């Protein structure tokens, strides 16, 4: 499986998690218009954690490394409000079996 296919699988997982839990873990959810940005970053975080697809940038790496100060320091104006969502995503979602085959 190539990296693009791996990322598509992860993106579907993140999108599903967003649809189910965004209103619970994103305090500003009713005002958020950046769903795609959040799904892209969530995908980057899980790809980095699971070592599939393409590795994420410095923010994704900081979240995966559990580095709170660096996570906030590298977060953009959207992600600063999404860190709890990303942490819950990272710790509550397991890698799909289709990625480990």
Model-flagged regions — what are they?
Residues 8, 12, 16, 20, ...:
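Charged/polar, solvent-exposed surface patches and flexible loops
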Residues 21-74:
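Amphipathic alpha-helical interaction modules
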Residues 72-101:
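Amphipathic alpha-helical binding modules
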Residues 1-16, 32-37, 55, 59, ...:
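Alpha-helix boundary/N-cap detector
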């Amino acid at each position: 499986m190539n990296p693009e296919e791996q990322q598509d699988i992860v993106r579907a997982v993140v999108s599903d998690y967003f649809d189910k839990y965004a209103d619970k873990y994103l305090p500003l959810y009713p005002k958020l218009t950046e769903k795609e940005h959040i799904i892209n970053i969530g995908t980057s975080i899980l790809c980095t954690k699971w070592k599939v697809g393409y590795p994420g940038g410095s923010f994704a790496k900081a979240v995966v490394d559990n580095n709170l100060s660096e996570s906030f320091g590298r977060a953009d104006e959207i992600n600063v409000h999404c860190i709890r969502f990303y942490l819950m995503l990272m710790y509550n979602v397991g890698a799909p079996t289709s990625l480990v085959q």
